[in-house]
Amino acid sequence: MSNQQQQQLPRQLPQPHPHHHHHHHQQQPGQHSEFPLPDGWDIARDFDGKTYYIDHINKKTTWLDPRDRYTKPQSFEDCVGDELPVGWEEAYDSNIGRYYINHIAQTTQLEDPRQEWKSVQEQMLSDYLSAAQDQLENKREMYDVKQQRLNLAQEEYNHLNKLAASRSSLCSSSSSMSRHDPELLRADLMLARERVRQLKQELNHITNDISYTERGMNTLYSVGEKINARQNGCYDIAEVQAIREEMLKVHKSLVSGEKVREELMRSLVQIKNELSRQQINEENAELLSATSPFDRVCVASQTDLCGAGEHLNGGARFAEMAKTKLQYAEWRKHIKKLQQQLADHVERIEPGQLESDKDRILLIQEKEKLLNDLNSISLKSRSAEEKLVIQQTRHKLEEDLKEAYEATNTCVANRLRFHEEKQLLLAKLQEALKSTNLLEERLKSFSSESTFSISSGSSLGSLSTASSKSALSFTDIYIDPFAVGESPIDVVDLQRRSQRLFQQHQRLPPVHPAVQLQQQHQLQQQTQPQPASEVSLSPRSSLSIETPPASPMKYNAIADQPQAQAQAALKEEPTYANAMPAPPAYTAPPSVPMALAAVRTHPYDLDSTVLDCMMLEAKLQKLNLSSPLNLNGPLSPISEKPSLLDLPQEMLSRSSSTSNTRSVSAAVSNESVAGDSGVFEASRAHLPRKELAQVQIGLKYLKQEGVLVVSLERANNLSALWTATTDNSQVYLRAALLPNSLTSIRTKALGDFQKPVFNDTFAVPISLDKLLTKSLQVTVVTMTGQKEEIIGTVQISMAEFNPDDSTLKWYNVLSSKFIPTFESLDLPSTSAAAAAAAVAASNNIINNNNNNNNNNIREESSDESTITSSQTSTLTRNQAPPLELQAQIAEELPEHVRLNEQQCSDDDDDDDEEEDEQQLVGTLGLTHSGCMLDAYLENMKQEYADKETNTDCAFPPEKLRSQTQLLDDRPVKRSQTFTPSAAVSKNRYNCRLNRSDSDSAMHFGVTPHTFHRGAVERRSLRFQPKATKSVTKLHHTHIPRTSLDLELDLQAQHSKLYFLNDQISKLQNLKEVLQKACDNKDPLIAAWAIENEEFQRLVARADPTKCPEERLLQKLLMKTTKEIHKLRKTKVPKGCPDLVSFKEKMFFFTRKGMSVPELPNDFLLPDAQAIEEEEEDDDEDNVAETAIAINTALVASSNRNKNLSEHHHRSTGGAVSKLTATPTPAINPAPVATPVPATSNANEANGEQQRYDYVVDRNYGVEV
């Protein structure tokens, strides 16, 4: 190779082989292109493009650039930033991840040599072992104290037994006032025997705990010694790969073993039920049908047999579904908030600290009980030496208790407070999961009539980790599903009881701060409203609940209000969420019943569509906006009226009755079509809300008398409509039936604007036919001296009123600020004539305009569907107002339509879950306002031409432009796919770059931006494919796993396998004993199986008769636990180690898992020792085979290190012996990729001797 080639080769960057994806080395030979190679050096490339260097003088090859010794740091102390010193290289493996190569020492390691995380882990392991040793000492001391109590109890039992056996005491002929009453003595004897049995059982539990803790500590000690025995305390890559494969094998054994355990537990449930039957039959056969687990009858689900809302019509069903969807989203958001709070609590209490506190408090209790036992001993029959020992023991116990209480008060108080807060959050989370599940089932009941689907995939707090399918995560290894959802350790209760005993002993008043904390939390829990646990399935009550409006076209331009302000604003406000399970942030006033306070409808009915549009037009003019309202939005299939979702809540009209909805089937919904095409993404406005003024109105119609009873009960927050300027201002309500009402009714005037209570009832004679054509208008009027002013209006459609039912509902009050030019619509006095005349005049003007205009406003339906209508009105669509309007009237929209704006971009991988977070658009039925609406729209400033859908495009010449403008100058808005049917000027043709005509109703984005899930713009408009990332970009900021992490993961898997095998063995023994007891009808064992709490908890986990909701809740809790862990990991700063996770790993080894109860020795059957030899059926054969397989896996895994070292030695030796004959890396570099392939291809390279007798080792880059 010439010198010119030698100077050019270094400038060539390595080109990775397309099939080489296993290892990536970060070498950049181009960085030294300005420096020539030393004399005698050459550059070459292997088969995958990796550059290596040839030393012709020493006849060696290496991966290291010889020029690095002049440009790179010589040691780690000289490194700056992410630099590595000379001889070190960072590489990447697709299975293992990043690892590091030390070419000088010819070693590889998993840890980053620049980081000190390994030393921090070793120090943490040492500290934890020290703390675990203290905890173990507490357990041993507790064992000693309990042993002393057992000795005292045994002594007392022996004493009573002797008295009972004495004929002089039991068979005495003395009177009943003798020294020992036989009946009392027998009772004392039974109590003493039971006390001895219970103490023995507790002693057995403590022994098991001690052995479990000792085994875990021994495992941690062995892990530390094993890592310290390694060179540099690191595993090489071959060992890491072997450990990973072994972990996967153990995981497979765990999966199969867990199936066996579940089968055994199910069989235990059946045996327990059979024992319960036998026990009941023996005691009272009549109770069998009442208490048998298999004869229960549950009628809880009968209300769902026909489906929720099966009897409802289309509009009512869709409204109910929309309301339920909103509540479901609110609960999901509440669950995420609770998950976030729980993730914050994890860092406050170190893993294992609560267990240590429990042991400390239990030790105090044991000492207290021992002290009481010693105080109850009679010293009369004792010797002097025994008396001295007892007195010394008492004195020592009193001193120990004093010191223990002082230490407990100072150290445990804060942890108990954090633990209690965590338990409250867990209880709220459990309640939230229950309520979410109920709402989810209710939403699924609408699936037969809806195109929307609900998935229970994961909660909002879920975060995608995108881990490899072949790798085990932290939650897979260290989270025990049987430990999730168990009754937590009530350390606070233990502490209170212990404190009470100490205070009684010392006769001191309570001073422990934990008691005060508990009382405070109880008070807060009483004052804070909790989510309801039951769902009302009544169609009338559920449909009368408000569905807040929202627009899919808006974006959130308003910053979030502080949470405290939002809660304060909603505290006294009755909302829709109270009728169904709702987050605690939304409550009704205590004086209002839940079923009524939650009811709130809009102030205007469906007949007031024109008035709504006029109000919004006035609002636009007030805001000085040039473009008026554009009614081109998506229309629901059950509505022929614009949904008006973009209006403020005070302007919306909505029917709340259930029976007289007159909805008409119209065109196919844009939402359903676009949703089916996969391009529709519904979004919702995320805007804060203010307090709304409301009026509670009751309506009832007396058919026999022909009288409408109107009850104006109370109002709420009228100060939001008007601020009193003087102290003598008063407010009253005035109501009238429009149109053509000559009389009006009014309430008494009150000075309270916040919560005035009127309680006025009026009877209005009117026939039912006329009533259904009327609208009830209620105005809020203020009086300041002699001056009256209308500040708000409520309008209720009587066409939707159900005369067979009475209603009492809250209605939002529309402020008069929104209708400054239409104040004449309100009644100025007790007479309604002026108002009726004004309305009639407005109708005449609109009708005249309608007759003068020849073009009706129409627009093509989505994907060319036919419009079916029984009305004379035409189909229109509601489009979002301009962006300027959105920014101006944003504060008028309710806050509870803000659906999870913060978690929309959390998980880009869960499309199914994201679909669940989309809201349903509630549709409103059309009555008689179509013609009026068309007439009004034709008089708007900007009109739209009547054009049919056609695929032929014909633009007229520019010379005909003036003539065309004279005919019709209204712009035509179409999608790119479809073109106008007639000749249209290009200036009038507003083309939207959307995929199909079903997209024409979607918002046309003004600013392009990258894709964000749940954002305003459509994905098809905003998604830009990102450039693929290079696989060689390995600069991650997270802390990688160390060898200590890897060894802990492996030992955790082995520990789980060991205890799983032990549990299976105990369950098999227990099953055999209980089965024989069932066959023999043993009453003792049957009583034990029914009364033993530990056994009851065990079988309750696998009870097939358990309510499906409970099983689903258990799964949700398990999933939520994993999501909390993932959420907490996201809080760890980049580049910082996760200290809490490492502590949880260590705590796993000393944490006690599921325990299998053991029968007392007195209950064991004589032939219970030969359980393993008996085989009843094929299922037990499978159980035995699986247990043998697990045992085999345990034995095989114990020789891992030995096999690893031998395999590594043989592989290295084989590579050395055979690779030395390989001639040149340039001709045959493949055999040196890894030691194993090198042995297989060495024979092929023996006959290719050319120039050099050395090769390149892919890991170390030196001659071998």
Swiss-Prot record:
Alphabetized CDD domains for the sequence: WW
Sequence ranges of Low complexity compositional bias: 1-14, 513-544, 845-856, 864-876
Domain C2: residue ranges: 691-811
One GO MF term attached to the UniProt entry: kinase binding
InterPro entries per the UniProt record, alphabetical: C2_dom (IPR000008), C2_domain_sf (IPR035892), WW_dom (IPR001202), WW_dom_sf (IPR036020), WWC/KIBRA_Hippo_Reg (IPR051105)
Keyword Membrane in annotation: yes
Superkingdom of origin organism: Eukaryota
GO cellular component, one term: cytoplasm
Annotated function: Regulator of the Hippo/SWH (Sav/Wts/Hpo) signaling pathway, a signaling pathway that plays a pivotal role in organ size control and tumor suppression by restricting proliferation and promoting apoptosis. The core of this pathway is composed of a kinase cascade wherein Hippo (Hpo), in complex with its regulatory protein Salvador (Sav), phosphorylates and activates Warts (Wts) in complex with its regulatory protein Mats, which in turn phosphorylates and inactivates the Yorkie (Yki) oncoprotein. Kibra acts synergistically along with Ex and Mer to regulate the Hippo signaling pathway.
Quaternary structure and partners: Forms a complex with Mer and Ex. Interacts (via domain WW 1) with Ex (via RXPPXY motif). Interacts with Mer, Sav, Hpo and Wts.
Name the record gives this protein: Protein kibra
Gene that specifies this protein: Kibra
